[in-house]
Amino acid sequence: MATMSAETISSQPSAGDLSGWNERMGCEKKGVPMTTRKLARLAALALSTLALAAAAQHKEGASAPEVNYQAGTSPLADVAMYQSSNPKAPKMTQAEFDRARQIYFERCAGCHGVLRKGATGKPLTPDVTLPKGTDYLKVFIAYGSPAGMPNWQTSGEMSEADVDLMARYIQQDPPVPPEYGLADMKKTWKVVIPADQRPKKKMNNYNITNIFSTTLRDAGEIALIDGDTKEIISIIKTGYAVHISRMSASGRYLFVIGRDAKVNMIDLWMEKPDTVAEIRTGLEARSVESSKFKGFEDKYAIAGTYWPPQFVIMDGDTLEPLKIVSTRGNVVGTQEYHPEPRVASIVGSHFKPEFVVNVKETGKTLMVDYSNLNALKMTEIGSAPFLHDGGLDATKRYFMVAANNSNKISVFDLKDSKLAAIVDVGKIPHPGRGANFNHPKYGPVWATGHLGDETISLIGTDPKKHKQYAFKEVAKLKGPGGGALFIKSHPKSNHLYSDAPLNPDPKISQSVVVYDMKNLDKGYVTLPIAEWAGIKDDGAKRVVQPEFNKAGDEVWFSVWSAKDKISAMVVVDDKTLKLKKVIKDPRLITPTGHFNVYNTQHDVY
């Protein structure tokens, strides 16, 4: 966080205007004004709180897109947890504790961690919070900090009573969510259609290679959409807020995982594609993948969880859980023990029988050899903390993963199982899978956008023919603003597309930008995707995730609004950059991520 500037400090109340500040601070109790002395103390407390907060965080501060991204709801909000008794902490009833715990996991856990040990935000454990006291913490929660701590009360997100509740809650011992082991998983494991009773051949007339799997976030569903006819094939119940869709190596099975760690295995050969097996692998999750290496196609699936911090390898036909591995361990660099390092992205290697498992807080990438689960071998490679999402280069040999809060891209050689490079990029890189294309000067490059700034970083990926540019940031493209989540291209396209759904400016969040890859110097053109959708209500209409069809001549976008508003899918002609089709249907509730079967199966992006 930035230290407080003179301008910031001068914007705080002086002794002469404390009476007006009294009302703004909510410092009157039962209608009786506070004394000037008490109010002055509170003003000083507020100043010191904000100054300390500013000094404690990242140098440049957090942007609105970063805060929006980190503060997402956790499914742990609905999990019962034990309230321990700490005699030093302020008193809380069980009802107050349960309410505060729910608020914490809905608003705070994404930054401060499940156990309040700190993640991208600072620790909020009793050893830190008790010495500060309730009044100090109330000011901090209510008014936020210049570095990105939200102003929960003044923004209207929390009431004064909520702020008081949370100030007391973070002085309690952190409640620990239950572990989730093999017995728990097997209670949820269900084989809907046994493998030997499934179709022996494709039983439908769909071009399944051009089906799109679209997350219907708040409905707890996915939509399978025919990429040829633009018609919805089916709506399938899933876990909450499916984070990603991944394909089996054969292209037959679709795996999706919700934030609540429920995995669905969907058979695209069925007359009407549907779930054939399901399981819950934990309490919160983001990643699922299947085995890709020759000889192991479709043999295994893997899911990684945020809580408990672990991954599980499953049978590729039935999702039976076979092997659970914890990811708790020590942070790269500091070597401090971390009790909850979350499993972020997972990809299947095309060069070895390995899953590439990225562990967020410890900054470790695990090359997990699945050739013998009874004698499991893992190669642990450290790079930078806060590993998140990423994708393969065009040769599929190199895996590029964002260490988002470290502002770096870690590059791994999947053939030799080693770290190839760590590349400094912009603020909070968020590539999704990223985008591969041939630059006229630098040769093959991989691109990522950023949550925290307006740039797109291009990184060279060819150490043979363009060695001088390999695994370096060779260029930056300028976009309209931060808040980017996904960037995409296609081998048959001349265009590079980038969204910015978390940008606070609706003009930016409701559109996408497109670059001509043969003439990057001329900048971008803007496509008003939300406007093209023709939705007339007051929904947010955030435009999310460019995704090509199999042929590479269409680009699909989600137009995402709240569940009580109208959403849509918009299809654009890649060559002309003109509107081609708007898909509207009452069943398209909060569409966000969407994944083309062929491109996902073959890692084309």
Task: Locate predicted features.
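Electrostatic cytochrome c docking/interface patches
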Residues: 61, 65-103, 200
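Short loop/turn segments immediately following beta-strands, especially the blade-tip
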Residues: 267-270, 316-320, 369-373, 414-418, ...
